[in-house]
């Protein structure tokens, strides 16, 4: 007998192919143009080589995420896995570093909106577009407005179309002239050597954010325990190969002297390569699609981090005013304004600096997931009940250790300034732990990362099913 009060159950309709496609679209192929100029300058035009290294490193990490999903077949995150494997303090610090990522993600979207719109309307400064985007997202967040899901689907569809046309134009340009083109050269280390390629690959970690989003579909998968781990690995591989293809095609067709370009030219390189290959109309189409997508991503990131700050304020881990809700709309207005004030840094930071900071947090979280596999499977709490098999040792010991080593290698390839900011942020996290635990005498409270990096649909559902509770200002 069905009761009207029972919540509707999600239909288990997604197989391996559907889950993989979700993961690839969540990563967004057009992301390759976010750091197109930055990484090409760092690697002296060897972006495909950097992507290849990044894909190899990410496949090991994806395998670790897949292993953790098998153990915890629910939507999880690096914070969840670290907290379960190593306890509250390690989990909190991992979550704290992830929070740094969440704070910078809206910022980089605002910056890109300003940079790209300025290429079409050069009379208006970059900072004006950036500030307007920031204020609009803040307003929408306070009012509780989110983008319609159909618009997100349209942006994804247009992005895929754009990339397909771009690759076709790039190959036509590369092979349509009389100049001989080297197919292999973009995959070599170049004069900068493996160090430059590693630095580029470290920045590209931000291209893979969200590859684990497949884990949120556990209730909609036909065979979640089997298919979701596979889909995580397949979506990482497929998305990575698409990144390599796009960067390779662009590198064959457009080879400027990257070291001689100005900072502004480097940041807007994605627009420049579109203009060279497709002309003004194609470039305008690219900018329109990219800006709308960046605006949606900025909104999603803003809502996500505002709710995390709200929860931390509510639980006493951060100042209580962060838990204040707007009287009329019930949204975390103080937290939203705090995120926007932080995002004002976009007016004077470089795109490269922000990209490095996002990669710092991402790589730190990835490293902890790799360690969590080793701890969970080889050294479980309460001890092992049976001997370790060779297969288990290779899958849950050697593979995640390689993933950890590769991640740390890329992590150490980031700029020194990035490490300084990251170290200060971690130190603040340790101080917070000391305060909320009364000098490490009480257990470390859990952070509310239940939503991870939610999609717009998830945010809509969150607002309907789990309205925020708290003091209304």
Where are these regions (language model features)?
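Membrane-interface "cap" regions at the ends of multi-pass membrane proteins
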Residues: 1-37, 41-46, 58-63, 75, ...
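Helix-loop-helix junctions that connect adjacent transmembrane segments
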Residues: 5-10, 44-48, 52, 125, ...
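Extracellular loop-to-transmembrane helix junctions
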Residues: 11, 24, 32-129, 238, ...
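C-terminal membrane-solvent junction of multi-pass transporters and transport-like membrane proteins
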Residues: 17, 151, 321-330, 366-419, ...
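Membrane-helix boundary/coupling elements in multi-pass transport proteins
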Residues: 74, 97-110, 203, 208, ...
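TM-loop-TM module centered on a large, flexible mid-protein loop between adjacent transmembrane helices
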Residues: 80-81, 87, 118-119, 231-299, ...
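Membrane-interface loop-to-helix entry segments
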Residues: 114, 126-180, 232-237, 355-368, ...
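A generic transmembrane alpha-helix motif of multi-pass inner-membrane proteins
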Residues: 361-362, 394-473
């Amino acid at each position: 007998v069905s009761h009207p009060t029972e919540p509707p159950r999600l239909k288990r309709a997604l197989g391996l192919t559907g889950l993989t496609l979700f993961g690839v679209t969540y990563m967004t192929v057009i992301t390759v143009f976010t750091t197109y100029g930055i990484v090409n300058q760092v690697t002296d035009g060897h972006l495909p080589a950097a992507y290849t290294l990044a894909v190899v490193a990410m496949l090991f990490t994806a395998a670790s995420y897949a292993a953790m999903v098998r153990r915890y077949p629910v939507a999880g995150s690096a914070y969840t896995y670290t907290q379960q494997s190593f306890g509250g303090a390690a989990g909190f610090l991992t979550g704290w570093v992830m929070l740094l990522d969440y704070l910078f993600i809206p910022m980089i979207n605002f910056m890109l909106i300003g940079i790209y719109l300025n290429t079409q309307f050069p009379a208006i400064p970059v900072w004006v577009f950036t500030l307007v985007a920031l204020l609009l997202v803040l307003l929408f967040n306070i009012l509780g407005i989110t983008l319609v899901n159909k618009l997100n689907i349209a942006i994804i569809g247009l992005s895929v179309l754009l990339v397909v046309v771009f690759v076709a134009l790039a190959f036509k340009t590369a092979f349509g002239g009389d100049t001989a083109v080297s197919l292999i050269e973009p995959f070599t280390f170049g004069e900068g050597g493996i160090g430059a390629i590693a630095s580029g690959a470290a920045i590209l970690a931000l291209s893979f954010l969200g590859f684990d989003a497949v884990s949120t579909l556990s209730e909609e998968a036909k065979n979640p325990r089997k298919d979701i781990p596979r889909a995580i690995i397949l979506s990482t591989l497929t998305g990575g190969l698409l990144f390599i293809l796009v960067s390779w095609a662009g590198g064959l067709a457009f080879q400027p002297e990257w070291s001689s370009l100005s900072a502004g030219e480097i940041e807007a390189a994605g627009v420049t390569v579109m203009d060279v290959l497709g002309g003004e109309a194609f470039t305008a189409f690219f900018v329109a699609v990219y800006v709308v997508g960046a605006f949606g991503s900025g909104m999603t990131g803003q809502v996500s981090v505002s709710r995390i700050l709200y929860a931390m304020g509510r639980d006493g881990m951060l100042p209580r005013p962060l838990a204040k809700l707007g009287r009329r709309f019930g949204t975390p207005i103080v937290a939203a304004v705090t995120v926007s004030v932080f995002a004002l840094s976009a007016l004077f930071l470089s795109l490269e600096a922000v990209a490095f900071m996002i990669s710092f947090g991402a790589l730190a979280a990835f490293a902890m997931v790799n360690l969590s596999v080793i701890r969970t499977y080889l050294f479980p709490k309460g001890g092992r009940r049976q001997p370790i098999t060779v297969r288990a040792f290779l899958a849950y010991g050697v593979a995640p250790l390689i993933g950890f080593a590769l991640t740390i290698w890329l992590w150490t390839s980031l700029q020194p300034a990035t490490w300084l900011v990251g170290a200060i942020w971690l130190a603040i996290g340790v101080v917070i732990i000391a305060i909320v635990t009364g000098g490490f005498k009480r257990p470390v409270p859990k952070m509310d990362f239940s939503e991870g990096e939610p999609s717009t649909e998830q945010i809509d559902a969150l607002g309907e099913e789990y309205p925020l509770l708290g003091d209304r200002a």
